[in-house]
Design a protein with these regions (language model features):
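The Walker A/P-loop phosphate-binding site
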Residues: 1-92
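Conserved inter-motif catalytic segment of the P-loop NTP-binding fold
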Residues: 60-145, 159
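A conditional alpha-helix N-cap/helix-loop micro-motif detector
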Residues: 10-14, 42, 105-108, 146, ...
Length: 167
């Protein structure tokens, strides 16, 4: 098992947000960004998919990123402009971002297993999900399905914990 001392911090690309998070996003943990539509959650995940590739001395983790996209929000053109802002080759940056589009909660859960497989071939240092709960909300409507939905989300969170332990 990994020790707490091996926790690293990933820069968000924002000094203010890094300060709020105590230096950046911790590895070996789950960090959730939530807010209203249009509040910047997707922007943050795009930023992290770029900063994770930076050298450690520049706030990155020198690794690849995986995105499970449940809302069709991934925008390669945003990644390209962010990469250029860091003086990175946009094509190389995009080649280190592995995107899977999940159309329902079962696919979303399966993609965590696929991300773990991918981590055996590449130094995956970030797994992002945009959005964690949207597929579950769309499939489990009404109060009568709340218990079932929460049970499935809990199973998904356990899978995410396994991913953290396996990378």
């Amino acid at each position: 098992e990994k020790r707490r001392g091996e926790v690293e911090k990933l820069s968000t690309g924002s000094n203010g947000l890094n300060e709020l998070l105590g230096g950046g996003i911790e590895t070996q943990s789950i960090t959730e960004f939530y807010g209203e539509f249009g509040s910047g959650k997707t922007q943050i995940i795009h930023q992290l998919l770029v900063t994770v590739q930076l050298p450690i001395e520049e706030g990155g983790l020198n690794g690849h990123g995986v995105l499970i996209d449940t809302e069709n929000t991934f925008r390669p053109e945003r990644i390209k402009s962010m990469a250029e802002g860091y003086g990175l080759d946009p094509k190389e940056v995009l080649s280190k971002i592995h995107v899977g589009r999940a159309y329902n909660s079962d696919q979303q859960m399966l993609m965590v297993d696929k991300a773990l497989e991918l981590a055996t071939k590449h130094p995956v240092k970030l797994l992002g999900i945009d959005s964690l709960t949207s597929a579950f909300r769309a499939e489990f409507l009404g109060r009568g399905t709340l218990a079932e939905r929460q049970q499935k989300i809990r199973a998904h969170m356990r899978d995410l914990d396994k991913f953290m332990e396996g990378t």
